[in-house]
Amino acid sequence: KNREISLPVGTYNMIYWGTPKYEEPIYSNPVVVDPQITIGGDLSQQYFGLRKVSADTTYYPVFDLVYTVKPAHIGTEELSAAMQRVVAGLKVIVKNKNNGILSSSIAGMEVHVGGIAEKLNMYTAAPVNQTKTVSFPLVLSADGTQMSNATVMLFPSSAKPMFKLIIKLKNGNTKVYQQPLD
């Protein structure tokens, strides 16, 4: 439910954050640590942050976030703004070379992407500390021919972030494949 607020007539820098409508499925469990907004607080010192996975040193994917800052004259103009996406989407699909059924010895797959920003500045959307690793699972298709994920959203990355595919086998072994992304 929207609540009305009243501001004195004047020019303000309006900060807009939001999530766009989705055309295709996205990762179902995104999370962010929200900024701690207080009356009289300095928004340039507030951040949206990654939330750590409690079981290890990785972080969860984030919401699909859009942002802009736009001056607006309250009292004489409608509030509206064109917003820009401040995250990147990633979809991974793993298949056999021959598009056949994946090996029954595979227990599961997980993706790790390194070099991801720890947080985004609330006022500028600038990324900070691009050293974190985000992880997410891949899911086996109903026909058993591929493992994939719904699109995950990530904060901006450093140049050439490291992509790591971790394949867990039913015999307890793990195989890891990695390469930098362009």
Task: Indicate residue ranges for each PLM-predicted region.
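A short, Gly/Thr-enriched small/hydrophobic beta-strand-prone motif that recurs across taxa
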Residues: 82-97
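Short, low-hydrophobicity acidic/polar segments
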Residues: 1-86
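Short helix-to-loop capping/linker segments positioned immediately adjacent to catalytic or ligand/cofactor-binding
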Residues: 79-80, 99-102
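A residue-level signal for beta-strand positions that form part of recognition/binding surfaces
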Residues: 78, 89, 108
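Tryptophan-paired
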Residues: 1-31, 102-182
